[in-house]
């Protein structure tokens, strides 16, 4: 059935120009006549086409009827209405400019879009006596013909048994259900396959050859169904997880030679080294990729502790090892004494501190005029006298590196006048 002609000599006004009042609204219990029904013509409608919501068995002597988008009959969802007396058409806030209402209550929607799919409510008013109006609602769900779906993937080339893949059935379609097929059959029950709540997304965990596909998805609603083209995952060969072996995890700064080795060994892989997240250049002496498997550092400093990583690569990609951090042994550096230059008078307190850079932490000890005074970073002598004048030295020692170094200063304690302080280094 084609579109009906629009009613002649109709008045068209907006919903803002009409105020409807009713003293009493009761639901109408219709007599035992044929039930009002609504059908879509054509039953399958494609996007961009027209569809007529054709009303059957409409009661006679109706003063008017209203169409709403959705199941709620409020102002926000109000599309259009037809008032029989005066043949008045009223447009509501939900009117898009593509809807036409006819005198038999049928609704034509032109140039249908995806947003037009869903439930429509026909609200009819039946004349009662002078004190009441009888109202009834009829709902109808408009389904658009489902589009041909396609499968999008987060990764069409996963590593076998190592990587997860997300398959999505597109486009997202309202009022439709999603089905998935693998090898032409419904999905097998396995912990490696998991569907989202809407079934639109399929998650594959640790893809193996047994679940590589082909996969198809289907979009279905009550009037149509469409299935995608098949998609098969291209499994890449599994890469072993690399790891680093090293000849010395506790090298001495600027002394020990380090040799890092990336395992496992294979002629099929290229080896790349990383320091602090930056790739290290390949030595000019490396003639074959396999030779870059070993990284030689003639010496290492305290600023090169790492992390170090190695990566094995094939033509499809790579995989990095866990990081390795060195414990570089260094120091002690030349110590510093604070305060380094000061004057003392008899009766004052002498309070000196000694600092150095060292790994592991250095041992500290103090001497005065070559005689051992005490251990520790601080030296405190209360109420010094002239007898405390002399050569003060802080010595530091690192048992791991075997290195020892000292710093000395000469302190002169005077009476009423300031003493002289000079520094010397040994």
Curated annotation (Swiss-Prot):
Question: What's a single GO BP term from this record?
Answer: female pregnancy
User: Pfam families attached here?
Assistant: Ig_2, V-set
The keyword Transmembrane helix belongs to this UniProt entry's keyword annotation: no
Keyword entries, A-Z: Disulfide bond, Glycoprotein, Immunoglobulin domain, Repeat, Secreted, Signal
Task: Identify its protein family.
Answer: Belongs to the immunoglobulin superfamily. CEA family.
User: How the protein assembles, per its UniProt entry?
Assistant: Interacts with latency-associated peptide; leading to TGFB1 activation.
Job of this protein: Binds to the small latent transforming growth factor-beta complex, consisting of the N-terminal TGFB1 latency-associated peptide (LAP) and the mature form of TGFB1, thereby leading to the activation of TGFB1. The activation of TGFB1 leads to stimulation of naive CD4(+) T-cells to increase FoxP3 expression and to an increase in the number of FoxP3(+) regulatory T-cells. Induces the differentiation of a suppressive CD4(+)LAP(+)FoxP3(-) T-cell subset. Induces the secretion of TGFB1 in macrophages, but not in activated CD4(+) T-cells.
Tell me the protein's name: Pregnancy-specific beta-1-glycoprotein 9
Native source organism of the sequence: Homo sapiens
